[in-house]
């Protein structure tokens, strides 16, 4: 974990031997500062649940969709709202939506800890052909 600190994330990358291949940037997940179709993959780890409003979480998912290239993949690991994320990705036209969970022991710990021990990942793939969000709205 990096504690949401870019310097810690860069140190983790250095320890893994990949620091020269990454750039750390802090941004609002509801308004990402990247052009449309910039990335092959988007990875979010224990972040989106921090948006307390479902509409704001939906905006974050829309931003993930916007910055993904066609056929790009999103991996969203979080401690709650998994069904909401899967439904949101489906509304955005993602395919191959999967829930990747933990072992029964970890699931039990999650149940008694209100989810704090068991992030579940939602994986989804952006369709290879799509219409941009901006084109649909205007």
Predicted regions and their residues:
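A short acidic, Gly/Pro-enriched loop at the edge of an enzyme's catalytic core
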Residues: 27-42
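Conserved beta-strand signature within the Rossmann-like core of class I S-adenosyl-L-methionine
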Residues: 71-78
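A short SAM/SAH-binding and catalytic strip from SAM-dependent methyltransferases
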Residues: 40-55
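Class I SAM-dependent methyltransferase SAM/SAH-binding core
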Residues: 1-31
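Short alpha-helix
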Residues: 9, 13, 81-92, 117-120
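A short glycine-rich, Lys/Arg-flanked "PGG" loop and its adjoining helix->strand segment in the class I
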Residues: 57-70
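Core SAM-dependent methyltransferase catalytic element
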Residues: 92-93, 97, 105-138
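Conserved Rossmann-like nucleotide-binding pocket used by diverse enzymes
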Residues: 25, 43, 75
């Amino acid at each position: 974990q990096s504690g949401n600190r870019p310097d810690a994330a860069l140190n983790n990358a250095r320890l893994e031997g990949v620091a020269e291949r990454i750039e750390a940037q802090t941004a609002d997940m509801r308004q990402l500062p990247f052009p449309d179709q910039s990335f092959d993959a988007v990875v979010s780890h224990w972040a989106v649940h921090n948006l307390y409003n479902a509409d704001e979480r939906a905006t974050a998912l829309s931003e993930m969709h916007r910055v993904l290239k066609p056929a790009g993949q999103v991996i969203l690991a979080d401690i709650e709202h998994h069904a909401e994320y899967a439904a949101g990705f489906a509304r955005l036209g993602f395919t191959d939506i999967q829930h990747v969970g933990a072992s029964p022991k970890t699931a039990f710990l999650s149940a008694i800890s209100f989810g704090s021990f068991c992030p579940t990942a939602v994986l989804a793939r952006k369709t290879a052909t799509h219409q941009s969000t901006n084109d649909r709205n205007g």
